[in-house]
Amino acid sequence: MTPEIIAAIKQRIKDFTYIQDVRVFNDQFTKMLADGNPFGYNIASPAALIEFSPSSIEQLGNGVQIYNPIQVTIHIGQMELDGNDALMDEAISIFELRNQVYLAMQEFSTEQMARMYRVSENPDYNHGNWYVYQIVFETSITDHLMQRPKGYTEASPTLTTTGSYQ
């Protein structure tokens, strides 16, 4: 994954939602709630974590490769103790965040990334007072890191032999 793609997705979420804590996913919600928070995670609420699933990589030619398809999961988390509706265990504001992220990311693209399309979504349970929701998008991403310059050709080694063969 390229740093430019990660930065573009992070910025898109920040620009089109009220989520400002946007990071690369490292199972922070689970680790933060581990006994005594041994990993030291401190996440602002609401938060969005970006996860790139493993993908097959194809060679396009001239050094360019493509991740096709690749799934990008946005883990949306919000700490909520009470939804102000007298129902302690029913905080529905996570769905407002889900809608914001969906509207921001559906059909989002960059020069290296094809349009993103939502393919699934689901709640993620067992995170204490954190409500977590996942939206999975699918896209294709080209990697130009090893792209050869236009007109590039491999140099053939020049071999010079001396002596004779009998």
Labelled PLM ranges:
Residues M1-V64, G151-Q166:
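Small/polar-rich, solvent-exposed N-terminal microdomains that initiate assembly or binding
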Residues R12, Q71-T73, Q134:
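One-face residue pattern on beta-strands with alternating periodicity enriched for small/polar residues
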Residues Q20, N42-A48, A91-R148:
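Acidic-leaning, charged glycine-interspersed low-complexity segments
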Residues E51-G83:
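Active-site-adjacent structural patch at catalytic or cofactor/ligand-binding sites
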Residues E51-P54, I76-E80, L97-F108, Q166:
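A short, hydrophobic secondary-structure junction motif
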Residues L81-I94:
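Short histidine-centered catalytic/ligand-binding loop motif
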Residues D85-A86, M146-A155:
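Short, charged, solvent-exposed linker or helix-capping segments at domain edges/interfaces
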